[in-house]
Curated annotation (Swiss-Prot):
UniProt cross-references to InterPro entries, sorted A to Z: APS_kinase, CysN_GTP-bd, CysN_II, CysN_NoDQ_III, G_TR_CS, GTP-eEF1A_C, P-loop_NTPase, SO4_adenylTrfase_lsu
Family: In the C-terminal section; belongs to the APS kinase family. In the N-terminal section; belongs to the TRAFAC class translation factor GTPase superfamily. Classic translation factor GTPase family. CysN/NodQ subfamily.
Residues binding ATP: 466-473
Region span, Sulfate adenylyltransferase: 1-457
Record-given protein name: Bifunctional enzyme NodQ
Domain of life assignment: Bacteria
Organism classification: Bacteria, Pseudomonadati, Pseudomonadota, Alphaproteobacteria, Hyphomicrobiales
Region (G2): 88-92
Native source organism of the sequence: Rhizobium tropici
Signal peptide start-end: none
Length: 632
């Protein structure tokens, strides 16, 4: 007997394919809070006799405990967590699979709360169809528009508009027609291939599995029948072969295979393949599946490929069809959905992960934000939680990808915060930027080592960070004078001075502060490449940007120096009168007052300035630098 499971989507689909080689329909349910999404899926499974009797008994017990009397609370089929039951909401995406005599299904129940839109995006990323629920009493709401837009953005082509709780409006045809007309009107801009509207009552089962006698005016199919028979995209639109290598298999010296799951397309013994990044060519000599050798394999299958030639292939490479190669680039345009409570800041360094790559990346340009309610492009300097933007992204090294609209498997990515390791965004790649192909590194005969040898010194970047008024500039100035007397070649980059020229166009918002440090770090890198000892005196309040600066430099070149002066002392000194203005509310985004300062957690040098003369602190830095240089 078929029954619902709660396991990962990949494992579900593999299990279903092994049961029967027929296609699987992957769909999501989404809508506003309390529209009845979990109740609908629970009713669907129960009425289709896909829930065991002992599970039904548990549901009856849960219904009584939940205050619902003897009536079964079908939402509890999916809402398995105690916290969910107590709060009466679905907290995260719940995956289940089931099958009928006509089709097999994977369903994702996604939350309707505004702050959980990211989970809806997770559920939609692999779905073929979206069941979007609408409360017949409330009609089309903001979340209906939001979820419809995200479904379209994430590549879903087919929609069922489930007008639920039809019993609460006395099965009214005019109200149903008005809701459908409004939805069709606004969704016409979203490019869905089909929209099927079904009036239903998930609570009482009307038009869920069986056609309801209470809706004689409705001539269409009930939900389950429609899901069993809906025609999806034509199978002749075959996506090209993409095989991310997850593991190199070397059980002995005579065998070398490449294990992974086929992301898209199909492959057969004898087919030519190419390593996407290197361009090395070969052909498939053997395909090894869990049950043994086979002649061919297709999307979703875990296999080990053995190649006919000895080519350099490593974990993270991608084997592809030579006739339809993916893009390999370090710059591209993408649609980005932001998940995190902390905003996305252009210029900040994040981790970007794809099927094959994990690489440092920066949003170089936020072109605009997309209003998911009105579909209007709006100017923006950052993205807040649940917002969608179109941006240019640059990665530290080239990555392999397809356009998302052509291949969802290899056209998506996630953004990870470098500090917390939390997933903070997800994106869909539109196209590579031509500039990436037109700009190349010029080979130079004189390198950093030659320039450093000429100066008889090793380059370094001394990065002084601390609050305004902490003494950074005074110490930095004394340090440069000291190094100059020692015959060292230096340059001092000061936070105020660079804002008179290079960064004169930047303000003091979080976005501009990030860009300020990005530019300075790049300049410091060039100066270090020239063989100089670079002294940087900047508040640089954010750890992420200081980490970015460190990663730009050579190993051991970056020395973070925390100029630690208490806020009260900085405010007392107030050499430029800025604290007085900030405390009076006349300066916005002032570090330490109205904008945060993230102190270094593990600096190379921690200078506590209270009771110390700047010259003595400068000497302390010089001594540290000298000892560091002697170690190299």
């Amino acid at each position: 007997m078929p029954y619902p499971f709660s396991i990962s989507p990949h494992d579900m689909e593999e299990h279903l394919v092994q049961e029967d080689k027929g296609p699987v329909l992957r769909f999501i349910t989404c809508g506003s809070v309390d529209d009845g999404k979990s109740t609908l899926i629970g009713r669907l499974l129960c009425d289709a006799q896909l829930v065991f009797e002992d599970q039904l008994a548990d549901l009856r017990h849960g219904g009584i405990r939940g205050g619902n009397g003897e009536e079964i609370d079908f939402s509890l089929v999916l809402d398995g967590l105690e916290a969910e039951r107590e709060q009466g909401i679905t907290i995260d995406v719940a995956y289940r699979y089931f099958s009928t005599s006509k089709r097999k299904f994977i369903v994702a129940d996604t939350p309707g709360h505004f702050e959980y839109t990211r989970n809806m995006a997770t559920g939609a990323s692999t779905a073929d169809l979206a069941v979007i629920l609408v409360d017949s009493r409330q009609g089309i709401l903001q979340q209906t528009r939001r979820h419809s837009y995200l479904a379209s953005l994430l590549g879903i082509r087919h929609v069922v508009l489930a007008v639920n709780k039809i019993d609460l409006i006395d099965f009214s045809e005019p109200i149903f027609d008005a809701i459908v007309a409004e939805y069709v009107r606004f969704s016409a801009k979203l490019g869905f291939a089909s929209v099927m509207a079904i009036p239903m009552s998930a609570r009482f089962g009307d038009n869920v599995v069986s056609k309801s006698g209470k809706l004689p005016w409705y001539q269409g199919s009930p939900l389950l029948e429609y899901l069993e028979t809906v025609e999806l995209d034509a199978p002749d639109r075959q996506e090209p072969f993409r095989f991310p290598v997850q593991l190199v298999m070397r059980p002995n010296a005579d065998f070398r295979g490449y294990a992974g799951r086929i992301a898209s397309g199909k492959i057969a013994v004898g087919d030519p393949v190419i390593v996407a990044k290197s361009g090395l060519r070969s052909s498939v000599r053997a395909i090894i599946a869990p049950d043994g050798n086979q002649i061919s394999a297709a999307e979703g299958e875990p296999v080990t490929l053995v190649l006919a030639d000895e080519v350099d292939v490593s974990r993270g490479d991608m084997l592809v069809d030579p006739a339809s190669r993916p893009f390999v680039s370090d710059q591209f345009q993408a649609h980005l959905i932001w998940f995190d409570a902390n905003p996305m800041l252009p210029g900040r360094s994040y981790l970007l992960r794809t099927e094959t790559d994990s690489v440092s990346a920066t949003v170089t340009v936020l072109k605009h934000q997309l209003n998911v309610d009105s579909f209007v492009r709006e100017p923006a300097k950052l993205l807040q939680m649940n917002e969608v933007g179109v941006c240019n992204i640059m990665t530290q090294r080239p990555i392999v990808f397809d356009a998302y609209k052509e291949n969802r498997s290899t056209g998506n990515f996630i953004i990870v915060d470098r500090v917390s390791s939390a997933t903070v965004g997800a994106g869909m790649i539109d196209f590579p930027l031509r500039r990436a192909d037109n700009v190349h590194w010029q080979a130079l005969d004189v390198d950093k080592a030659a320039r450093s040898a000429l100066k008889n010194q090793k380059p370094a970047v001394l990065w002084l960070t601390g609050l305004s008024g902490s003494g950074k500039s005074t110490i930095a100035n004394a340090l440069e004078a000291l190094l100059h007397t020692c015959g060292k070649h230096t340059y001092l980059l000061d936070g105020d001075n660079v804002r008179h020229g290079l960064n004169r166009d930047l303000g003091f918002t979080a976005v501009d502060r990030v860009e300020n440090i990005r530019r300075v770090a790049e300049v410091a890198k060039l100066m270090a490449d020239a063989g100089l000892i670079v002294i940087c005196s900047f508040i640089s309040p954010f750890r992420d940007e200081r980490r970015m600066a460190r990663e730009l430099m050579g190993e051991g070149e970056f020395i973070e120096i925390f100029v630690d002066t208490p806020l009260d002392e900085c405010a007392r000194r107030d050499p430029k009168g800025l604290y007085k203005k900030a405390f009076a509310g006349n300066i916005a985004n002032f570090t330490g007052v109205s904008s945060p300062y993230e102190a270094p957690e593990n600096p190379e040098l921690h200078l506590k300035t209270m009771g110390q003369e700047p010259a003595r602190l400068a000497l302390q830095i010089e001594e540290f630098l000298r000892s560091r240089m002697e170690e190299k």
